[in-house]
């Protein structure tokens, strides 16, 4: 029996009842969660996450408010997640978890928001959105951070509304960038993605954010996306990048005759491009990819590799598990330039000054 077990056998039995989801073991697990041994407490909390129902959530959040042990706090977070994710009614589970927020202190509220992101659903999103509109600066910051990594397209209209109605410039930027992230990463009908791209281009205040939209257009080429890129090209600061996106769509089901007319009307001219040297990697773990890059460099400032992955295009990963960059030295029309690009970024070479 779990209630009579001692030492390592107690931990083994707690793991067993968790695997079997033995609800009757909840009282013994609850008692073990107060044990002096950190290993016993951690095993007990993991077990509680596997067997208790959502009615127990307030006790877990109350415990989260009092613990000073980082590992125990992480175990409590996991238990909260497990309880909600096991629930047959996740909306009801999210509602119960959200109901614990008013009584929680600031740090616990932040952790609850993170858990709601994992649980997902309408109630979770509603709760996080409300936090993003609150007067509490810490809570707002956490809510915007959570919305920035939300796991469904449902957050898009909320992010747009937040962008349009918050006063803080930093939050406006985070909202529109999160909105663009949804357009870039999630499955959705082509019409909706195109509409989101149009909206983002009209709404974003900074050219840097509008350029993120251009990357979305290039990732999902279509006649509609081409039309959006051509519209963006009317903005002087975006003209070059937008036209390069149009070029990048060539050969992917786009009407080539219309593409040629559009490029001629835009006055986009080819350049004389030379790749002087190119290296890919991080620090000393860098490989020379000059010859490979030269194979794909044409007479445009955008270079299209055979794969969206630099590792695939350049024949391997020179620095596994490390953030890498592609550094290129080049000449355009005889003028020397240099650019550093984050891993897998679209290769667009700036005009040298």
Annotate the PLM regions.
Residues 1, 8-23, 27-31, 39-53, ...:
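Structural detector for internal amphipathic alpha-helices that build alpha-solenoid repeat scaffolds
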């Amino acid at each position: 029996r779990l209630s009579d077990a001692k030492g390592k056998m107690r931990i083994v039995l707690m793991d067993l009842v968790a695997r079997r989801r033995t609800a009757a073991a909840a009282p013994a697990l609850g008692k073990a969660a107060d044990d002096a041994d950190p290993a016993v407490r951690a095993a007990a909390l993991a077990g509680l996450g596997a067997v208790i129902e959502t009615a127990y959530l307030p006790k877990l959040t109350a415990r989260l408010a009092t613990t000073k042990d980082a590992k125990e706090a992480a175990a409590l977070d996991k238990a909260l997640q497990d309880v909600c994710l096991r629930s047959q009614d996740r909306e009801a589970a999210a509602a119960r978890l959200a109901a614990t927020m008013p009584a929680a202190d600031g740090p616990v509220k932040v952790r609850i928001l993170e858990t709601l992101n994992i649980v997902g659903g309408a109630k979770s999103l509603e709760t996080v959105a409300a936090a993003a509109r609150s007067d509490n600066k810490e809570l707002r910051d956490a809510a915007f951070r959570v919305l920035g990594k939300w796991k469904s397209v449902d957050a898009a209209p909320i992010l747009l509304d937040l962008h349009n109605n918050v006063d803080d410039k930093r939050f406006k930027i985070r909202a529109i960038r999160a909105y663009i992230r949804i357009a870039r990463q999630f499955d959705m009908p082509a019409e909706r993605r195109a509409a989101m791209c149009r909206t983002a281009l009209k709404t974003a205040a900074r050219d840097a954010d509008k350029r993120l939209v251009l990357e979305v257009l290039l990732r999902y080429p279509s006649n509609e996306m081409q039309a959006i890129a051509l519209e963006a090209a009317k903005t002087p600061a975006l003209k070059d990048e937008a036209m390069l996106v149009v070029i990048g769509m060539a050969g992917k089901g786009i009407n080539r005759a219309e593409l040629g007319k559009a490029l001629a009307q835009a006055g986009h001219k080819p350049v004389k491009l030379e790749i002087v040297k190119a290296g890919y990697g991080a620090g000393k773990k860098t490989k020379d990819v000059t010859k490979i890059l030269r194979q794909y460099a044409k007479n445009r400032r955008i270079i299209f590799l055979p794969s969206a992955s630099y590792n695939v295009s350049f024949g391997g990963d020179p620095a596994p598990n490390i953030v890498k960059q592609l550094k290129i030295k080049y000449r355009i029309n005889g003028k020397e330039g240099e650019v550093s690009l984050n891993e897998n970024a679209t290769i667009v070479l700036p005009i040298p000054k």
